[in-house]
């Protein structure tokens, strides 16, 4: 079978709901008083958008093959990411065979080492990589999970991230992850409010439902350690992303010091096999949580997963909807998945990338069979207005 080549790469941007899931209207739970690295400043505590968490916006990348097939993916990156794709990365994609994904990844990564390695550059590389997998699977008329080796389980089960784990339990999810609302700068009173909120939720969901805390890089080691010990009596399953991503030493100490049986998780804002190698070799966590749209795409996530598997560490990717689902269903060391509750009050199940994507699957009763539609099985919504800020 002769494989087509890639004739065009396009980078588009979108504002509002989409891959940049923080870009929401006022009143959404995700923009509430939630602890962040900026919570040390009172003027930036009440709303995460106040310090610009949503400034990037969504990046949509399309790759078109010589036979007219179009693959696409969405990630966070907006106009900055679009510039990187159009003005730098496109040269490594156009003219290549659709099968040469490894070569294209390697060239994109090494060509951007002097200003990249992590952050928006890796978001852009990840988006291109995901679009390439979507394209190849469509050319072959197969789902992406088939290209990754095939399913190892018939269906996925999910925990829910959002403000209402009690409602998530009613919907059939296996657990609920709450955002932490108060950081160290809010002192003893803030700590007590954090614990009171957890205790209230435990009383609502009962003793056997998983409860976790998402700390979003907002804590220091002493505070995180104390929070873990005081939350242990409330049956906290894990404490997530307590520290800045580069504080590997802090994570290693935290993992040593938390109560026996409590899990330490992180990795949402880590990237590449080298970043995750540090987390694994320094024994920083029990579960790694790479975001496939930020860590380097599927090509890199497979390498990250192999490193973790060799050390007996679980890989539970951060969010990412279909881009995670097609991966998780093919890996034994990814036994469940995360679902971000994107309804404003976290009171119903809606697609993560709504309204940008069509045919995006969602869990029913906390479970899902990953579709066998070619590619990632989703379509761009033609009614969503997109812009192409740069061309090459």
Curated annotation (Swiss-Prot):
SMART domains: MR_MLE. CDD domains: MR_like_2 (cd03327). Mg(2+) binds at residues 214, 240, 268. Its cofactor is Mg(2+). Its EC number is 4.2.1.90. Keywords: Lyase, Magnesium, Metal-binding. Disulfide bonds: none annotated. The active site is at 318 (proton acceptor). GO terms for molecular function: L-rhamnonate dehydratase activity; magnesium ion binding. The record marks 291 as: Increases basicity of active site His. Binds 1 Mg(2+) ion per subunit. GO terms for biological process: amino acid catabolic process; carbohydrate catabolic process. Substrate binds at residues 22, 48, 338. It catalyses: L-rhamnonate = 2-dehydro-3-deoxy-L-rhamnonate + H2O. PROSITE patterns: MR_MLE_1 (PS00908). The record marks 338 as: Transition state stabilizer. Reaction proceeds via a syn dehydration. Belongs to the mandelate racemase/muconate lactonizing enzyme family. RhamD subfamily. PANTHER family: ENOLASE SUPERFAMILY, MANDELATE RACEMASE (PTHR13794), MITOCHONDRIAL ENOLASE SUPERFAMILY MEMBER 1 (PTHR13794:SF58). Homooctamer; tetramer of dimers. This is L-rhamnonate dehydratase. It comes from Burkholderia cenocepacia (strain HI2424). The gene is rhmD.
């Amino acid at each position: 079978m002769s494989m087509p080549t890639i004739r065009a790469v396009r980078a588009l941007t979108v504002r509002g709901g989409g891959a940049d899931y923080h870009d929401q209207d006022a009143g959404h739970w995700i923009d509430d008083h939630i602890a962040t690295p900026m919570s040390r400043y009172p003027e930036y505590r009440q709303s995460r958008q106040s310090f610009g968490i949503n400034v990037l916006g969504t990046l949509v990348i399309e790759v078109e093959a010589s036979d007219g097939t179009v693959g696409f993916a969405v990630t966070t990156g907006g106009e900055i990411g679009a510039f990187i794709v159009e003005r730098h990365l496109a040269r490594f994609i156009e003219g290549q065979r659709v099968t040469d994904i490894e070569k294209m990844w390697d060239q994109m990564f090494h060509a951007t080492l002097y200003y990249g390695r992590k952050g928006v550059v890796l978001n852009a590389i990840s988006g291109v990589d995901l679009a390439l997998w979507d394209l190849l699977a469509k050319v072959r008329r197969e789902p992406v999970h088939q290209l990754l080796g095939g399913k190892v389980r018939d269906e996925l089960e999910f925990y829910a991230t959002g403000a209402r784990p009690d409602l998530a339990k009613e919907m059939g999810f296996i657990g609920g992850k709450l955002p932490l609302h108060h950081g160290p700068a809010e002192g003893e009173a803030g700590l007590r409010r954090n614990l009171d909120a957890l205790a209230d939720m435990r009383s609502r969901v009962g003793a056997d439902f998983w409860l976790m805390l998402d700390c979003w890089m907002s804590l220091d080691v002493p505070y995180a350690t104390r929070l873990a010990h005081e939350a242990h009596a409330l049956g906290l399953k894990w404490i997530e992303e307590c520290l800045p991503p580069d504080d590997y030493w802090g994570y290693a100490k935290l993992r040593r010091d938390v109560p026996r049986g409590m899990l330490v998780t992180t990795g949402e804002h880590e990237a590449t096999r080298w970043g995750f190698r540090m987390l694994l070799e320094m024994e920083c966590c029990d579960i790694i949580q790479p975001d496939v749209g930020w860590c380097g795409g599927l090509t890199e996530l497979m390498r990250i997963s192999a490193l973790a598997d060799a050390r007996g560490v679980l890989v539970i990717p951060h969010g990412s909807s279909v881009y995670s689902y097609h991966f998780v269903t093919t890996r034994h060391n990814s036994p469940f998945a995360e679902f971000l509750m994107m309804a404003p009050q976290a009171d119903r199940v809606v697609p993560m990338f709504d309204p940008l994507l069509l045919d995006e699957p969602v869990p029913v009763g906390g479970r899902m069979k990953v579709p066998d539609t070619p590619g990632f099985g989703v379509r761009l919504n033609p009614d969503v207005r997109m812009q192409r800020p740069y061309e090459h």
